[in-house]
Design a protein with these regions (language model features):
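Noncatalytic, basic helical substrate-engagement surface that gates or grips nucleic-acid strands
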Residues: 2-137, 143-162
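Feature 3881 marks metal-assisted phosphotransfer/nuclease machinery
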Residues: 162-180
Length: 180
């Protein structure tokens, strides 16, 4: 039985992108990459994983059925200043380079589907590997519906593990919130 770390990659990147306090764009990008690499290393080590799978975003099929799906994100993006747009372009160039590094220079798996979000890919991976253990790395509460005896979620922002047993502090392994 293998233990997979399934990384909601864009979710992790966006969290890392907004952590750094530096004003210099190169320093902020460097800090975001540092946070991503160290986050994956921490989960790999703490959960004694066998393999890491980076799940990437594609265009959501949900937009074909429900036009307002995540439409507010475009509205917010359009309100950004020119500098913010330029910074985002640089961040996403670094993100693309990092994904290429993971795909070409490591033994990790990188998966993407043009018409599916990372959430969908993670759900399918778990479905296709029912006899293995899975650690989802994301802050997205949508993953709670995937919890099973062989599936947990690690939230690096709160340092909590979500499982069928509830929300546990990753350091103390004590319950922090009752299961809903």
């Amino acid at each position: 039985m293998a233990k997979y770390v399934l990384v909601d990659t864009l979710n992790m990147f966006m969290r890392a992108k907004h952590v750094g306090g530096a004003r210099d764009i190169d320093m902020r990008i460097g800090m975001a990459m540092h946070i991503m690499f160290n986050s994956v290393k921490k989960v790999w080590r703490d959960f004694d994983a066998d393999h890491v799978v980076f799940c990437l975003e594609g265009r959501s099929w949900r937009k074909d059925f429900y036009a307002p799906y995540k439409a507010n994100r475009k509205v917010l993006a359009d309100k950004r200043s020119v500098r913010e747009q330029e910074d985002d372009e640089m961040f996403f160039e670094a993100y693309d380079d990092t994904i290429k590094f993971f795909a070409d220079k490591t033994n990790t798996t990188v998966i993407q589907c043009p018409r599916a979000e990372a959430d969908d890919l993670i759900a399918i991976w778990i479905q296709e590997h029912p006899d293995d253990q899975h650690v989802i790395v994301s802050t997205d509460s949508d993953f709670y519906q995937l919890m099973a005896p062989n599936v947990v979620q690690y939230n690096g922002t709160t340092d909590q593990i979500v499982s069928l047993d509830g929300f546990m502090d990753a350091k103390t392994n004590k319950r922090v919130v009752e299961k809903k």
